Structures are given as structure tokens and as C-alpha cells.
């Protein structure tokens, strides 16, 4: 969850800190719960994509919390790099249960490979040469986030309507939150943005649970 660059008032930082702490708590609890769900259903073969999803989610939440909560750290530049890189990992990780457990055949392999190839390039650039794509970062995140529309037909055929609706709703929440991410002068802008991210991640979590149950 990348942060804005302006200085925030103490009350704004407190609100943002609360959002991050809630996110970490929910993320850890949710990651454990979804693994337990898969194990309880004897779906051990489903664990790799679930673990990838959980790792991407926790990476985003953890890196965002570190960057936004430790604002005076001498490692701030690197915290920012990891914060931004983790967004690519989160997007690709979120797609993984749907592409590997939901889709079948060529679509499953091809879409997973493309998503992770783009994410890997984005992660590498954000860690090593972050300023190269700074001005188009938001566009790249949105493009990767909505890349699944190219497989709209296969997804509609493979996923339960409720799961599909949750997947789309999460994407809409993420995209809507970008407005507040860019609205730098709005009071509590950063906390609102991160609230949208947490809400979207929660909706996508419900969708992942759905695809695990369906698989």
C-alpha cells in the first residue's frame, strides 16, 4: 500500500497506523484460517497456490506497515521500495488461486505465467530502479490488476457467480481507492486510501475462500 509523500498531522498518522495494525492482525488470522480450511477439506494439493496468495497478502500488509509506521527510519528509502514492490506480489498472489484452482488447461498456465512474469519485472524494477517507472506506477498496478478481463469468459465458466462477483468487487474497491491515493490534500487521505485497500483485500479473501471451497 504505497503512501503519499506529503507530511501528515499526528492524528492522520494515528488513523493510518490503526488501519495498518488492523490489516496485519486480519492478514495473519486470515492466512492461517484459509490454510486450515484447505487442510480440513483434505485439499492439500491446493495448498501451494493458497500459500502463494497468503505470502503475497502478508508481504503487502507487512511492507506497507513498515514503510508507513517507521517514518524516521534510516532505511526509509528501502522500505518504500519494498512497499511498492510488494504491491506487484500481492496482485499476482491474489490471482494465483483463481488461475490455478479455477481455470483449467491453457488458460490456467498461460495467464498464471503472464501475470507472474509482469509482476516479477515490476518487483525487480521497484527494488533496483524504482524511479524508472515512478510516474506510471499506478497505471501499471491497475493494468496488472485488471489483466484478468482477457480471460473473462473462462473465469465466468469456471467460477461460482458469487465468487466472481467478489473478485470483481475487490478490483473495483482497489481502483476506487486510487482516487484517494492521488488526492494528496484531502485530510486523512492516506488512512482512507489504506482503508480501501484493506476493504478490497478482505473482499478478495472471501473470493479466495470461495474458489478453495469450489475446487
Regions found by a protein language model. Name each.
Residues 1-215:
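Multi-pass alpha-helical transmembrane bundles in non-GPCR membrane proteins
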